[in-house]
């Protein structure tokens, strides 16, 4: 029997579509309190969060993650019910299996085993858990971080249990993430009859040269840890649906994924310069979802990489690719932060799953990392 697999199945059984928790955190809290963790529940709005800590001394090691999952999609497209964990052909199926209930289970059993073997370990252990990561993420991890920051509590080492592995368990560790800056651009024209263009101003035509320049711009060159900043259009909307009407405005949604070689303000300024150069009448609204961050190789990456090599035999590659996570909030108070978890090939998909054979090794990697950083000599 596998204690980690059993707990993962219990977590998957709970229909915790964001922002609901549905009792996942209660399961974890019961196990953590039994090994000496002091738990603070921090509910905000419809979101359940908790901060659990064992010990008062430094250094502080934190596991961070989320109990919420994305919606299932069409139930009839699943081979088995998404909230009835099912093992088939060596795979554990269920919504959240990879993102990230296997990691949550592995956090708990890793702590249980580490504390049993090292009851007087150095420093402190903590878990920061939310049910608001897959949604709007305004009442979750960021609120807990605000509370910790307000009382001067900082984290030395943090592992966020996001599914980072690609081909085999342990092949990829995320030691940073790009920033995310989105924009909503509305270019104004004058609506009119398509047969009388001299009496109208077509905002699509007006925007096209600026759009071409934005798409061709090299924003920066990146650096040793990050690829160059990218700018991508996600949506363009204009027109009434009729073929004989020149639209009065055109709306464009776009996103920057940016390296630390650029700032949100520098990117905004360059966009304004391009739009103004083309003489557009426009409105532009911005949303900054996260700043870029990096954890250079150090004690945490060394301990985690050594644990991965010992348990799975993989050589971990440090990477900053991919989307944003709650690491963007935690890094404010964390000296060293990485993301590491199971294979991510099926996350957010129908028939989400993890390799059963990876579940206990994942817990072992987390435990070995703890030993590398907090076990007394």
Swiss-Prot record:
Gene3D superfamilies with a match to the protein in the record: 3.30.70.360, Zn peptidases
Cofactor, free-text remark: Binds 2 Zn(2+) or Co(2+) ions per subunit.
Record-linked CDD domains: M20_DapE_proteobac
Residues annotated for Zn(2+) 2 binding in this entry: 99, 134, 348
Family matches, as Pfam families: M20_dimer (PF07687), Peptidase_M20 (PF01546)
Family as reported in the entry's similarity comment: Belongs to the peptidase M20A family. DapE subfamily.
Subunit architecture: Homodimer.
Name used for this protein in its record: Succinyl-diaminopimelate desuccinylase
């Amino acid at each position: 029997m596998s204690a980690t697999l059993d707990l993962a199945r219990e977590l998957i059984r709970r229909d915790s579509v964001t922002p609901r928790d549905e009792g996942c955190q209660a399961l974890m809290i019961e196990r953590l309190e039994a090994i000496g963790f002091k738990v603070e529940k921090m509910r905000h709005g419809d979101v359940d969060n908790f901060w659990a800590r064992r010990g008062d001394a430094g250094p502080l090691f934190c596991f961070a993650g989320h109990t919420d999952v994305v919606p299932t999609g069409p139930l009839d497209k699943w081979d088995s019910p998404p909230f009835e964990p099912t093992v088939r052909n060596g795979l554990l199926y269920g919504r959240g299996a990879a993102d990230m209930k296997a990691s949550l289970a592995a956090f708990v059993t890793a702590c249980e085993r580490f504390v049993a073997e090292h009851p007087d370990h150095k420093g402190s252990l903590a878990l920061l858990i939310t049910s608001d990561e897959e949604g709007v993420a305004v009442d979750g991890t960021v609120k807990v971080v605000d509370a910790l920051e307000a009382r001067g509590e900082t984290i030395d080492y943090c592992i966020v249990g996001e599914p980072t592995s690609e081909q085999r368990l342990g092949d990829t560790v995320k030691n940073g993430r790009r920033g995310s800056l989105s924009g909503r651009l509305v270019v104004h024209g004058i609506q009119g009859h398509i047969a009388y263009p001299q009496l109208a101003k077509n905002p699509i035509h007006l925007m096209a040269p600026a759009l071409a320049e934005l798409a061709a711009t090299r924003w920066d060159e990146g650096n040793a840890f990050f690829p160059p900043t990218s700018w991508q259009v996600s949506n363009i909307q204009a027109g009434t649906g009729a073929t004989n009407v020149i639209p009065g405005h055109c709306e464009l949604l776009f996103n920057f994924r940016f390296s630390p070689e650029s700032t949100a303000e520098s990117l905004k300024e360059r966009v304004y310069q391009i739009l103004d150069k083309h003489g557009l009448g426009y409105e532009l609204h911005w949303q900054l979802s996260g700043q870029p961050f990096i954890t250079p190789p150090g004690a945490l990456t060394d301990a985690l990489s050594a644990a991965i090599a010992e348990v799975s035999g993989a050589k971990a590659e440090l990477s900053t690719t991919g989307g944003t996570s709650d690491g963007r909030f935690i890094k404010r108070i964390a000296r060293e932060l990485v993301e590491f978890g199971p294979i991510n090939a099926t996350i957010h998909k129908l028939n989400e799953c993890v390799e059963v054979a990876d579940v206990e090794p994942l817990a072992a990697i987390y435990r070995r990392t703890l030993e590398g950083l907090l076990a007394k000599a």
